[in-house]
Amino acid sequence: MVKFDSGSESEMTNGDDLHINSKHEVKSRMANGNGVHNVPDHDQFQDRAEMEVLILPDLFSSLMSVPARENPHYASVKADADEWISSVINADAKWASRNKRVDFTYLASIWAPDCSAFALRTSADWNSWAFLFDDQFDEGHLSNDLDGAINEIARTREIMEGTAPRYTADSEHPIRYVFQTLCDRVKQSPEGFYAGKPSSERFYRRWMWAHELYWEGLVAQVRTNVEGRSFTRGPEEYLAMRRGSLGAYPALVNNEWAYGIDLPEEVADHPLVFEIMVIMSDQILLVNDILSYEKDLRLGVDHNMVRLLKAKGLSTQQAINEVGVMINNCYRRYYRALSELPCFGEEADRALLGYLEVEKNHALGSLLWSYKTGRYFKSKEDGARVRKTRELLIPKKMAAL
């Protein structure tokens, strides 16, 4: 596997059990927190005269200009996945309704339009886990608790390595239980339990490696919060941190599993193959930072490239334009890396082509999901309006922030 040294091995592996992630605590934080299920109130800003109109770059250019395909198992898998996660975390009716609208299964469906129902369900459940897990570090109780963050990651790593106790559906640690079921499933074939060939040890090592990159990014993010350095970093330092904490690396490898892609070591270890993963992670996070800009302002989220560039003296429109340039540069970096890749041979190249398709679908699915589900807008209709007009309306009193 491609590896990098974060310089924080001791921090990532040690720590006493500082936090009990109980169902009651999860439910309480979902009701009061600022995560993906929290819907900011837009209704008080209906007058266009009170808005600053920001023009977005064309986010559907280059690799994103292709039509998306939806997995045929989407409808049936969505119903089961939504019901299951709500049951596991003992969610109330309001949260369950919001979760249906967030629609993690749609996201998984665009990521892997040809995978089995079992693989699609696993991908949808991974999305549910990732957002619940991430919210703890992003705006939740671990966002400024470095020791607590390191400890929670250590407990989750034990699950991945098979050294943790078995959790149950009625466990006091529902997020850990969900992750344990995912580890169980990913060790199997994407066709289902005891169906087809189980995942190789080589693939599972890659799956663990991708999650380690994610967790190292989360620790770096929390450390930045604790040190109060959100707006003192340069764009490159921000990208280096966010491309890990975004969670795109494990999501991408999870989609490799959904398609039965097991990259040979000579492919997986090639620097340009990893560079393509980095590039697409950058594209996803930069697009996300534009579309989430208003929501991040409302919720006080500092981890946003537009906000970072504004802190450096740019106007909001100038900052958005600059992020648009960065996104287009991602495509140039992608094609440059692609042109320099060697040929590995028929079987390895077939796996590589599958990997490249997964990367493209991941970026496209993330983009479409943000518009379709109204994730960052007051409704799906508002998301459709933003996509059509490329106009993002920000209350003037907020635009000055």
Swiss-Prot record:
Enzyme class (EC, first level): lyase
Enzyme Commission identifier(s): 4.2.3.165
GO molecular-function term, one example from the UniProt record: terpene synthase activity
Pathway(s) of this molecule: Secondary metabolite biosynthesis; terpenoid biosynthesis
InterPro entries referenced in this protein's UniProt entry, alphabetically: Isoprenoid_synthase_dom_sf, Terpene_cyclase-like_2
Family assignment from sequence similarity: Belongs to the terpene synthase family.
Domain notes: The Asp-Asp-Xaa-Xaa-Asp (DDXXD) motif is important for the catalytic activity, presumably through binding to Mg(2+).
PANTHER family: BETA-PINACENE SYNTHASE-RELATED (PTHR35201:SF4), TERPENE SYNTHASE (PTHR35201)
The protein's name in its UniProt record: (1R,4R,5S)-(-)-guaia-6,10(14)-diene synthase
Source organism of this protein record: Fusarium proliferatum (strain ET1)
Taxon lineage: Eukaryota, Fungi, Dikarya, Ascomycota, Pezizomycotina
